[in-house]
């Protein structure tokens, strides 16, 4: 456990990198503009270089290339300053471990397995035949229904809900208001009404998955909806039934993924994206915020953007410029048409 105050040499001993200048003590990470002498900050983007000169930060995390411009400052030189900053921030943000015990108002149904190392909060509910791993934290008013399986050190924040039969891997974190395993939107038209299709699958989340507040991941119609290891999903995201999401993909807020969509690994999906159902998105695809994805993306590594029609980011950026010039172009077109008409009249 690193102390609340630590020196630059202690940080580099834990995380690597090279410290330069004085081996000062720091107490927290702060932005360049707010940092004081007891803080460490970082420069990840060269366009903010001027802020370093004005910053009162006691130490700054920089790349080797940027370090040459800051002689006389206390530095930590790292290959990736932004990643290094994240790791330093983690050092100063203690991970809350489970305090073993079950609150008197919690309900643990017969047949549930709850190790002594787990923390079960006030009014939490653990269903029958559910198995919790070591060190889980099921906080106030959270619900884990029957026949679920949770790995070690899973955290359910207050009012999170995991429906029956779902599986969560190790170190999964579900934030408040999220619902894992509610019924998928499966309906068959019966001529004059809709007949609900029973959703008999479940949801499987891999290890190190994080689900934001008020996000919904629907259970599969017949097979499980799956989210791979290390994937992070923001607040207020809807994942439809039967979706398969690969490992280490990130999905930003307000995105809606329709049913039976397959998303690869290491994808980046911006906020407010919408997809049609039953399509595939290749590994390492980047989708810009607000994009409407209307067909499969089969080539890995593509950067896609645009509300409609979907296109590559390069094509979308070019077309966006044209959209802003449509009025001007229309006037020019009318002028040219008039000139052409006048020319014909004089012939």
From Swiss-Prot:
Active-site residues annotated for this sequence: 241
Oligomeric form and interacting partners: Homotrimer.
Top EC class, one word: transferase
Described function: Catalyzes the N-acylation of UDP-3-O-acylglucosamine using 3-hydroxyacyl-ACP as the acyl donor. Is involved in the biosynthesis of lipid A, a phosphorylated glycolipid that anchors the lipopolysaccharide to the outer membrane of the cell.
A GO cellular component annotation in the UniProt record: membrane
Keyword Hydrolase: no
GO biological process, one term: lipid A biosynthetic process
Assigned keywords, A-Z: Acyltransferase, Lipid A biosynthesis, Lipid biosynthesis, Lipid metabolism, Repeat, Transferase
Family: Belongs to the transferase hexapeptide repeat family. LpxD subfamily.
Protein's recorded name: UDP-3-O-acylglucosamine N-acyltransferase
Keyword Lipid biosynthesis in record: yes
EC number: 2.3.1.191
Molecular function GO terms recorded: N-acyltransferase activity
Pathway linked to the protein: Bacterial outer membrane biogenesis; LPS lipid A biosynthesis
SUPFAM superfamilies reported for this sequence: Trimeric LpxA-like enzymes
InterPro entries on file: Hexapep, Hexapep_transf_CS, LpxD, Trimer_LpxA-like_sf, UDP_GlcNAc_AcTrfase_non-rep
Source lineage: Bacteria, Pseudomonadati, Pseudomonadota, Betaproteobacteria, Neisseriales
Substrates-to-products reaction catalysed: a UDP-3-O-[(3R)-3-hydroxyacyl]-alpha-D-glucosamine + a (3R)-hydroxyacyl-[ACP] = a UDP-2-N,3-O-bis[(3R)-3-hydroxyacyl]-alpha-D-glucosamine + holo-[ACP] + H(+)
Superkingdom, natural source: Bacteria
